[in-house]
Every structure is written in structure tokens, then in C-alpha cells.
């Protein structure tokens, strides 16, 4: 009898999780469909980029069935703020990303997408983690981004940014598909863990809020990457001093 009750409760909780799951984005036909409620305003940037000299930090190439994406990451070469950040954090940030999409069987670039962030008060950080957390499972890395395959020709490109030591890091996700580059997620979130299985990748996230008594109220989420879709599940909240 106890076993039956346990299995029943397990099934109920599984159903509740399915009900609470919400779609962040999905690929429908040739279109990336997303929800604006998961995209907070991007950082403000009013700098004249043409007057800034950049140095290339890294480069990745993503092969798709319909072509490939040539992605390059840059940071400014000089400036007082840049020197301060280099001295404080090390050379682990960038402020410009250029994505060149080359369609199959074509010799020239068919589409270029450029993301700038030269506002200085907000850094897009390499996936080093150690600047903001001491969790030992997170290995230091000089990777400018994380890439998750959603299918043979679609990718989720994850960037991690930080405004200052007070705000939680920002997780920004772009989906690349058939030459399209679309921002589908931009929220203040800390990454507590990353889990993978044969069919999905799960990012366990935490957002921090404060109640009227200045107690921390973490909200916990699972961000699930699976075939041609990203979904999110709110797990629970807890209060602590």
C-alpha cells in the first residue's frame, strides 16, 4: 500500500512539473518563436563603437546542415575602465561579438550579426565562475560562451554577464537557426549546476529577491534544453536570513 501511495505521489509531482513548465522558445518550421516575458531589457550602450580599437579574444565555428556560423569575440584594447577591469578580474571578458553566417555552397557571408557592449559598467564574462562564486565543481575556463546543440542545424549560444558585485550574473541566450540570430532569454540568474542526459541539458538556476524584511528569497528554476526547444520550470522558493 505504501509503495502504491509513493508511486502515486511521484506521478502527481511529475505532472505538476509538466504543468508548470513554460516554453522559452521553440523552432516552428523555419521560424524561431520566443516569449518576450523572458527577455529583460538589454544593457544600455551609447558608446561610439567606430572610435574603439578591438583585439580578438577567441573564435568558434559552428557547423550546421545548411551552412556554418563563424563567431568572433573581442574586447577594447585600451581605456581607463578596461585597464581597471583587467587589473581586477584578469583578461576574462569581452564586449563585442560578431556572428557571420555562411550559407552552404556560397563563398561569401550571407548575414552578419554584431552585438556590442561597451557600456563599461557591464562586462560579458568568460565562463570562469571564480570571479563570483567559490563552487568547486565549476572549472575555470577561458571559453567566451557555452553552446548547446538543439538540432543538427540549430544552436543555443549562452553568454554570462555581470554588472557589479551586487547584482546576480546575467544569463543571455541566443538561438541560431538558418542564418537567424535571436535573443530568447535575458535574466539575472546564477547557475547552480548543469546536468546532462541523452535527450536534454538542464541548467539549474537561482534568482535572488528580497522581501520587506530584507530577507533573501531565492527562486529556483530548471532551464531545459532539448530538441528544438528551450523550456523553464519554476521549482520552489525559500526564505533565509
Predicted regions and their residues:
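Surface-exposed loop and turn segments in beta-propeller and other repeat-based domains
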Residues: 36-39, 43, 109-137
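Beta-propeller blade signature
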Residues: 94-100, 170-177
